[in-house]
Design a protein with these regions (language model features):
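Conserved AMP-binding/adenylate-forming core of the ANL superfamily
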Residues: 3, 7, 11, 16, ...
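Conserved pre-ATP/AMP-binding loop-to-beta segment of ANL
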Residues: 24, 159-177, 183-184, 219-227
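Conserved AMP-binding A3 loop
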Residues: 36-38, 173-201, 205-208
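Conserved AMP-binding/adenylate-forming
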Residues: 40, 251, 269, 302-427, ...
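AMP-binding/adenylate-forming catalytic core of the ANL superfamily
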Residues: 49, 72, 93, 99-102, ...
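Structural core segment of the AMP-binding/adenylate-forming
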Residues: 53-54, 82-154
Length: 544
């Protein structure tokens, strides 16, 4: 059982408490490798001391450029132990994007997998602040000799295993860079305590109140049996937060290096995973297909949770038909807000209501002018959250002023997502306002239309966009990925969608694509959809 003298409010302190409580328990599994909490800490300590010897200290920014791995997690922990800041680097970035991020984030050190050596070698001459590089051997043959990269295991061998770091603070900074699907990525600045609290740390989920003492908090880690697998990449908040949430309570985390549906089910089976965390339909649909194709034992799973993107109703029903013993949860939120609300269904739930969530006690809806929207059925507004919210965006005061606002004397974050109150005062997420299609004065939210399209059995994935229209200003359009081996009947699809949503929301122009463009975490890439539509002929155009 966990017994601490006081509640820790710093990520590194929370992890060290778990190490002290359950040192021999497995902490992280990745492929055929596994490390205990004690081993995870020793390796993170060694890396931290190595980095400190090369000038990294409090406030320094360290890039972590890696797919999911034990080393990626160790690198983040090492940074926090030094009161430094780990910065997530998207492994899909090309030269210009890497140059921008390395410069904007003020990186002074970098830990990267060897497969990215050529990209790092090309960008380093343009980022003079970045002085020290550590390279993880991933089995590739990238050459890092030209910039003096240090082998990761050599760095660990040079560093002390001792936990002899300076005292840390709840005010230490955690940064999460956004995906950048609407422009260049931005670093969201959180205090350590705020990110922990925003994820539910030290808070009673029923009452929303802080736990009264450390003993109550300790009960969360009593059994340590809740094995979690975050399938999203660690460059995404959904995976980072799921991993830290597990480790803080002494629970094991299982990774697959990259998303492969069959590998996920193998990892679930081999490690008796109990909570599978993914990002919406983009991951759920391949998992459903792979489960049907394979012969996997998923009896250990008690919950499948989606972070950052809601499951469509059709996907929930498919999951529950295959795994009737599980609970399906949707968590809404963003890099700027943490978790804002949660919805939960099981095989006995009413599935006719649509994807709804219950707001946390600090979430409200506001109108476009920042005024409170009265909680009544049908009312639509922007999601706003107060309490433990970020400090703002790194080096972007204008964007900070726009997103972080004062309402009735309290500071709120308003990331830009619209939602609607339902009859029972749950909320339906409508989507990001910047993606809203204004067609003849009617607002159409892409996520609602995408859900209707994906409920057709021959549609695997879809993105909905607005394209110019002489009469309506914009018309609703969609790029669709048909299910493999299926010949999509466009007329039948339109007829089906008309039974799901109002006629003005039905896409008038359709494009077919072999694969829908999404971020590594599964988030929709709407700029990709716009480019695809501009470069290809549609399969159908209906009168607007």
């Amino acid at each position: 059982m966990f017994y601490f003298e006081e509640v820790a409010l710093n990520i590194a302190d929370l992890l060290e408490h778990a190490v002290d409580a359950v040192p021999e328990r497995i902490a992280v599994v990745c492929g055929d490798r596994r490390v205990t909490f004690a081993e995870l800490e020793e390796r993170a300590n060694r890396l931290a001391h190595h980095l400190a010897a090369h000038g990294v200290g409090p406030g320094s920014h360290i890039g972590v450029y890696s797919r999911n791995s034990i080393e990626a997690l160790e690198s983040m922990i090492a940074a926090y132990k030094l009161r430094a800041i780990a910065v997530n680097v998207n492994y899909r970035y090309v030269h210009g994007e890497l140059r921008y991020l390395f410069d904007n984030a003020d990186l002074v050190a970098l830990v990267h997998e060897r497969q990215y050596s050529d990209k790092v070698a090309a960008v380093l001459p343009e980022t003079p602040k970045l002085k020290h590089v550590v390279v993880v051997d991933d089995g590739s043959d990238g050459d890092y000799s030209s910039y003096g990269g240090v082998d990761y295991e050599t760095a660990l061998a040079e560093g002390s295993p001792e936990r002899d770091f300076a005292e840390r603070s709840a005010d230490d900074i955690y940064i999460l860079y956004t995906g950048g699907t609407t422009g260049y990525p931005k670093g969201v600045l959180w205090r350590h305590e705020d990110i922990w609290r925003a994820l539910g740390g030290g808070i009673n989920f029923v009452t929303g109140e802080y736990v009264p003492d450390e003993w109550t908090l300790a009960e969360q880690g009593k059994s340590g049996s809740l094995v979690r697998l975050p399938a999203a990449p660690l460059i995404h908040g959904a995976a980072q937060w799921a991993a830290f949430g597990a480790l803080f309570t002494g629970s094991p985390v299982v990774f697959v290096p990259r998303f492969d549906a069959h590998e996920v089910w193998k990892a679930v089976q081999d490690n008796k995973v109990q909570v599978l965390t993914i990002v919406g339909d983009a991951m759920a649909r391949p998992l459903i297909d792979a489960y049907r194709e394979g012969d996997y034992d998923a009896s250990s799973i008690v919950a499948v949770s989606s972070h950052a993107a809601l499951f469509s109703q059709s996907v929930k029903q498919e999951f529950l038909s295959l795994l009737p013993h599980v609970v399906i949860t949707d968590a809404i939120g963003s890099s700027e807000s943490g978790f804002t609300g949660i919805g939960m269904v099981s095989k006995d739930s009413d599935h006719s209501a649509g994807p709804r969530v219950n707001f946390g006690k600090d979430a409200i809806l506001v109108d476009d002018d920042g005024a409170l929207v009265e909680p009544k059925p049908g009312a639509i507004g922007l999601i706003a959250r107060r309490g433990h919210v970020p400090l703002g965006y790194y080096k972007d005061p204008a964007k900070t002023e726009k997103i972080f606002v004062e309402i009735d004397g309290k500071r709120y974050v308003v990331p830009g997502d619209y939602a609607r109150y339902e009859e029972d005062l749950t909320v339906t997420l409508l989507g990001r306002g910047s993606q809203c299609v204004n067609t003849g004065g009617e607002k159409v939210y892409p996520e609602e239309v995408e859900g209707a399209l994906k409920s057709h059995p021959d549609v695997f994935d879809a993105l909905v966009i607005g394209i110019p229209d002489d009469r309506l200003g914009q018309r609703v359009a969609a790029v669709i990925q048909p299910r493999s081996g299926k010949e999509l009947d466009v007329a039948a699809l339109e007829a089906h969608v008309r039974t799901e949503i109002a006629g003005y929301k039905v896409p008038r122009s359709l494009w077919l694509a072999e694969e829908i463009g999404r971020s590594p975490s599964g988030k929709p890439d709407y700029p990709w959809a716009q480019r695809y539509a501009s470069e290809h002929e549609p399969v159908t155009i209906q009168p607007a």
